Amino acid sequence: MTASTTINKGDSPNGDSSASSVLHQKVLGSRRFSNYWWASIVTLGASGFFLAGISSYLRVNLLIVTDPTQLIFVPQGLVMGLYGTAGLLLASYLWLVILWDLGGGYNDFNRETGNIKIFRWGFPGKNRKIEIGSRIQDIQSVRVDIKEGLNPRRALYLRVKGRRDIPLTRVGQPLSLAELETQGAQLARFLGVPLEGL
């Protein structure tokens, strides 16, 4: 869920977050190592295919590791060029998602003002900034959602009166059970609400 958790104003010396008044949790979005890895791999592979297609058309070797000038342009060079173009489009999308930091943001819980604020970055446009606010007294519980199997899901949700459950954890790689339990218990203790789903 968080890249870091910061507890401000009234930190207790024994690390008890229930004595403080502000809990700020940063949420990691699309700027994860795995996204950088796949964007780099797709860029390299697609560039190779694209340059191989161009090389077979121009009969000029544009690649260091092989000589694609021996390929016949129709159909091999053409198909490699099309694969390269499709791969470069996919790589562009992946790099833009990383640049925009989709899904990144923070969860801010402030007992002094009695407000919570959930902030996430979205796609560019009029709804780029996604902000959800509520009063702490409207929070009913912190819910843990665990689904095992081929596509496991482990997430924390905030159950608020009159609203759908608000997701608090990052999208992508699921958290470990220990980390999920720790963060859920810490948040429930801080807000003074029950922890459901365990």
UniProtKB/Swiss-Prot annotation:
Q: Which UniProt keywords apply?
A: Membrane, Photosynthesis, Thylakoid, Transmembrane, Transmembrane helix
InterPro entries registered for this protein in UniProt = PSI_Ycf4_assembly
- Give the record's GO biological process terms: photosynthesis
Location of the region described as Disordered in the Swiss-Prot/TrEMBL record: 1-20
Query: What GO CC terms are in its UniProt record?
Result: photosystem I; plasma membrane-derived thylakoid membrane
| Function comment | Seems to be required for the assembly of the photosystem I complex.
Identify this protein by name: Photosystem I assembly protein Ycf4
Could you tell me the gene encoding this protein? ycf4
